[in-house]
């Protein structure tokens, strides 16, 4: 028999009754019932119940052990009997009568309970992450991640893509976030950067003649944490394709995402095909370029209805309306709570009206609406008895943000929100440029390296604020999973695009010398995308925080509490790297 086990703790069934077995694992739980000791033994594969009777060496040995100690046991598989079957366990029809026990690793008193979600704070969990990962939910999340990545590789290969590695030590990149830098010992005063993404390398692979690339790529950005973004390190499925237009990128990625979410989504419905929603339309209808389409409500732009209005709350402002069916009969509390929610987002309040049975409007602002206002609102919003309408007014970006969040909250409160579904969409036609309101300068709106729609002619003849880029995002349930673009592979178009944003030719030639040089040696039209692995797993696991799907994440302050990183370097090491440290003075 094997030194440690003949079977795993998730393997034994009723057909194994009478078999002598050897198991190894962790002492998950213990119960003493009528003098008989019951132990749940856990390993990677599952749980098996052990039984030890008083007066036996096995009882004495197991009785002394602490939870989470590792043991090897020898014993015989016996039936639990029909009345004692545990239907929640695959091994629930049997138990193992223990004959021999060997302690493999004793556990100290635990800092928190492993076999229950007891509300321990995240900092404690991250300090003892090796214990936290023993919890069933965390173990399930990490194995889900493993399975998803394995499936990604298989499906991408089946779609004709080739997995290739790109460098980890590289030069600083123009993605926009802060780099993590690595000092060079051999080249004093010079630094490598950890890649924010393999963007330039995957484009260079296309220029090198490799047609379809993918990589499960580690990316490093020195940026603050959010619920859907872990600081420091994250992983994405980087993809690049040659001789493609936008729809050529969409087709394999949409197929991949649909199959992944159908396979690992726990039976939740996946909406396919994914609708294509232009950026401007998304901002107007949903108040966001990351719309949660589970909310079955839409905003309507009614700015024109109130142009020249004497109602000061709306006059001269961008006005958005949110019609909500079947809520007019709700109590005043319903409306007040939604107004309070809007205030938490920065609104001064939330105007609203009800639609009465006769079609008239009632509510706090009804008296400020003219007959023409009412007629236009009724027609534009397709109002009917039982509707209520909520209004937001202000600057475009401000009212979009507030009313976009109100849209989702109202849908949840009013029963117009879908559950158990993954609603995907593509956001397309992003503006190439935007104007800084303070300086009046034109700058890139999103990705400066995407191809402008209309090419060089558009750059030379159109108002920059009217130019759209071949840029696109995948959004699912209000979470941005990926950004991508058809790349700007022509040097003259790239130089002109940067000129419009205020960069002279010499600066661009110097800053992006490597890419421009490569583009001048026969670059193919190419495009790509990079879905975030961590966010995909977060959605599939139905977790609110991305750190719940990463084995060893940094905390919100970019610290590894378990390993003690970041650490200080010894003086000798600093000298070797030609560095000195100046700490900020305390304020």
State where each predicted segment sits.
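Class II aminoacyl-tRNA synthetase catalytic cores and aaRS-like
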Residues: 1-587
């Amino acid at each position: 028999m094997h030194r440690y086990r003949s079977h795993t703790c998730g393997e034994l069934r009723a057909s194994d009754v009478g078999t002598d077995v050897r198991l190894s694992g962790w002492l998950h739980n213990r119960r003493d019932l009528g003098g008989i000791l019951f132990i749940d033994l856990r390993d990677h594969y599952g749980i098996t119940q052990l039984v030890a009777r008083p007066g036996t060496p096995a009882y004495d040995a197991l009785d002394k052990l602490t939870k989470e100690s590792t043991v090897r046991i020898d014993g015989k598989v016996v039936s639990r009997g029909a009345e004692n079957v545990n239907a929640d366990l695959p091994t629930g029809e049997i138990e193992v009568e223990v004959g021999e026990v060997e302690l493999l690793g004793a556990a100290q008193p635990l800092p928190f309970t492993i076999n229950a979600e007891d509300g321990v704070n995240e900092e404690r969990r991250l300090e003892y992450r090796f214990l936290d990962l023993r919890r069933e939910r965390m173990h399930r999340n990490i194995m889900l991640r493993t399975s998803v990545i394995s499936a990604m590789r298989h499906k991408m290969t089946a779609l004709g893509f080739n997995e290739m590695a790109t460098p980890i030590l590289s030069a600083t990149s123009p993605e926009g976030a802060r780099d993590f830098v690595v000092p060079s010992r051999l080249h004093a005063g010079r630094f490598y950067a950890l890649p924010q993404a393999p963007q330039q390398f995957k484009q260079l692979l296309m220029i090198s003649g490799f047609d379809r690339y993918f990589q499960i790529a580690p990316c490093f950005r020195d940026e603050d944490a959010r619920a859907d973004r872990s600081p420091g390190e994250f992983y994405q499925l980087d993809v690049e394709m040659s001789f493609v237009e936008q729809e050529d990128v969409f087709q394999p990625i949409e197929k991949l995402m649909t199959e992944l979410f159908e396979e690992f989504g726990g039976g939740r419905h996946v909406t396919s095909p994914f609708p294509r929603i232009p950026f401007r339309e998304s901002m107007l209808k949903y108040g966001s370029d990351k719309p949660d389409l589970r909310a079955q409500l839409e905003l309507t732009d009614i700015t024109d209805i109130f142009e020249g209005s004497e109602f000061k709350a709306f006059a001269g402002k961008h006005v958005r309306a949110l019609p909500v069916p079947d809520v007019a009969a709700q109590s005043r509390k319903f409306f007040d709570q939604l107004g309070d929610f809007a205030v938490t987002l920065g609104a001064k309040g939330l105007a609203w009206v009800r639609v009465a049975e006769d079609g008239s409007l009632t509510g706090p602002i009804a008296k400020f609406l003219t007959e023409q206002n009412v007629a236009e609102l009724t027609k534009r919003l397709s109002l009917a008895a039982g509707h209520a309408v909520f209004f937001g007014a202000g600057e475009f970006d401000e009212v979009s943000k507030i009313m976009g969040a109100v849209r989702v909250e109202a849908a949840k409160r009013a029963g117009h929100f879908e559950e158990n579904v993954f609603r995907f969409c593509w956001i397309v036609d992003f503006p190439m440029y935007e104007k800084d309101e303070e300086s009046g300068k034109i700058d890139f709106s999103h990705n400066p390296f995407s191809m402008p729609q209309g090419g060089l002619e558009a750059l030379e003849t159109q108002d920059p604020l009217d130019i759209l880029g071949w840029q696109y995002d995948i959004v699912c349930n209000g979470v941005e999973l990926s950004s991508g673009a058809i790349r700007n592979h022509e040097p003259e178009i790239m130089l002109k695009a940067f000129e419009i944003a205020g960069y002279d030719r010499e600066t661009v030639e110097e800053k992006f010398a490597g890419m421009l040089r490569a583009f001048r040696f026969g670059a193919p039209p190419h495009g790509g995308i990079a879905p975030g692995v961590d966010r995909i797993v977060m959605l599939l696991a139905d977790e609110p925080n991305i750190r719940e799907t990463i084995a060893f994440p940094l905390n919100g302050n970019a610290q590894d509490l378990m390993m003690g990183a970041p650490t200080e370097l010894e003086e000798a090491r600093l000298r070797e790297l030609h560095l000195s440290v100046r700490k900020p003075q305390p304020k």
